[in-house]
A protein has these predicted regions:
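Conserved short submotifs of the Hanks-type protein kinase catalytic core
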Residues: 76-90, 94
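Protein kinase glycine-rich loop
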Residues: 11-18, 22
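Conserved N-lobe beta3->alphaC-helix segment of eukaryotic protein kinase catalytic domains
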Residues: 33, 38-61
Length: 478
């Protein structure tokens, strides 16, 4: 654990990108929690410009479904943005590959996404990179739209301008973005429609919205007897067809989406959230084709410092050059993360907006971001590292030990696009937690790899009850 400024500790790294990192800061006295984005490549004009624009956009926004902005600070070559800490993790983590989620949960998330996007548009702001990796959840599982590195103001003083920059993530962008100037609102609405398909079906409908893509071509020709459309009931499919209309002038508006019968229907909630986590085989039993996205799907990806799903320094070497295995457990556990120990916000910021941060009696243990891609093991830290390295070799992964207790894995998804994730070993309640986090690529594809790893290590995974704070942090509350 490192001190950032007096009274504020860097508890853990939430994400990293080509130009910087996202850190979790916790106040040692008040237990306030703040997410801090760090730009350490201000020598790159484009990165610095995007950072500046992101700050300008954040200053315009204040909505319950938009990540809160607290302020920014500059220290020499480093720049910082301080944001609300969304401890519920990323939306993609709640999507079970090839299955999706219960309709009640999907509807709740979708309605909140739509509410946030409607607010953005009312302020004249277009997000331009809406996808589950850029949507976070707070401690109560409410949506927080984040990552405004590609956002732009499309309406000012009542005058709207067409957009021309081709940016976003290919499976989620609207077809008109690829071919001509476009209007901001219909393009964001299209992205929301693709997110809805992912929520309900656990897969993406196409690689990109172009006639060169067979899946998209089939959709335009109304071929809906194939996956993922067969996973949607008629009511949901009717809404998706209205949103994913190729002609933006005929596409549903947010007001029309809110009035659709699927959006207004009261679905009965089902307790299925823990099923994916607790079972090593349930998600594998649903074997249907899945269209996966990858880094090649990201175009104009110049907002990389913003989040965990952003880009990571390129290809690693195989791990045989990492030196001898440390002898003591403390040396192979992740440094800078402590759950045995736990100045004010305005002391840390310049140019602040004084807003309430998350402050409670929670310990740093409970502030561990919720994630389903983690498990406890029965082995000690040394044995766990050896098991992971051996398995990664067998799976053909390229891996590297970045620091004690952290292994970065590089592989490819089904599209041959790069997929990067990290495995962190954390000592918690006298046990070893292995925590996997996506760094680059598609979240659904990452979760498939996690399931493979979890199943292959099943004999070493701890079974039985855990303490309540740990259950909360690991999304395993019964």
């Amino acid at each position: 654990m490192k001190e950032f400024v007096e009274g504020w500790d860097v508890v853990q790294t939430l994400g990293e990108g080509a130009y910087g990192e996202v850190k979790l800061l916790v106040n040692r006295v008040t237990q306030e929690a703040v997410a801090m984005k760090v730009l350490n490549r201000s020598d790159l004009p484009e990165a610095a410009d995007n950072f500046r624009k992101e700050i300008c956009v954040h200053r315009l926004l204040e909505h319950e479904n938009i990540i809160k902005y607290y302020g920014h600070r500059r220290e020499g070559p480093l720049q910082f943005i301080f944001l609300e800490y969304a401890s519920g993790g990323e939306l993609f983590d709640r999507i079970e590959p090839d299955y999706g989620m219960d309709q009640a949960d999907a509807q709740k998330f979708f309605k909140q996404i739509i509410s946030g996007v409607e607010y953005l548009h009312s302020k004249g702001v277009a997000h331009r990179d809406l996808k589950p990796e850029n949507i976070l959840l707070d401690a109560n599982d409410n949506i927080r739209i984040s990552d405004f590195g590609l956002a732009t103001v499309f309406r000012y003083k009542g005058e709207e301008r067409p957009l021309v920059k081709k940016c976003g993530t290919l499976p989620y962008i609207a077809p008109e973005v690829l071919v001509k100037s476009y209007h901001a609102e219909p393009a964001d609405v299209w992205s929301c429609g693709v997110i809805l398909v992912a929520l309900l079906a656990g897969e993406l409908p196409w690689d990109k919205p172009a006639t060169s893509c067979e899946q998209y071509k089939g959709w335009k020709e109304c071929k809906i007897t194939v996956s993922p459309w067969t996973k949607l009931d008629n009511m949901a499919l009717s809404l998706v067809r209205k949103i994913l209309t190729p002609n933006p002038t005929k596409r549903y508006t947010i007001e029309q989406i809110k009035g659709h019968q699927w959006t207004r229907k009261m679905f009965e909630a089902k307790n299925t959230s823990s099923k994916w986590l607790s079972s090593t085989s349930d998600s594998l039993s649903r074997k249907k084709s899945c269209f996966d996205i990858g880094q090649t799907g990201d175009i104009a990806r110049d907002n990389a410092p913003t989040r965990v799903s952003s880009s990571q320094p390129d290809l690693m070497h195989r791990g045989d050059g990492d030196g001898p295995t440390p002898a003591a457990n403390s040396e192979v556990l992740a440094h800078g993360i402590s759950f045995s120990q736990p100045a004010h916000l305005e002391d840390m910021l310049l140019s602040t907006q004084t807003q309430g941060t998350q402050s409670s009696s929670q310990s740093p243990l409970q502030k561990l971001v919720k994630r389903m891609t983690r498990f406890f093991v029965t082995t000690d830290a040394n044995e766990t590292v050896q098991e992971l390295r051996s398995l990664f070799e067998k799976l053909g992964y390229v891996w590297k030990t970045n620091s004690p207790g952290q292994i970065t894995v590089t592989t490819q998804d089904k599209r041959k696009a790069q997929l990067v994730f990290k495995a962190n070993l954390i000592e918690m309640d006298a046990r070893i937690l292995v925590d996997f986090r996506l760094s680059r690529g598609d979240g659904l594809e990452f979760k498939k790899h996690f399931v493979t790893i979890r199943n292959r290590l099943s004999e070493h995974i701890a079974k039985g009850p855990v303490s309540w704070p740990i259950a909360v942090a690991t999304n395993s509350v019964p």
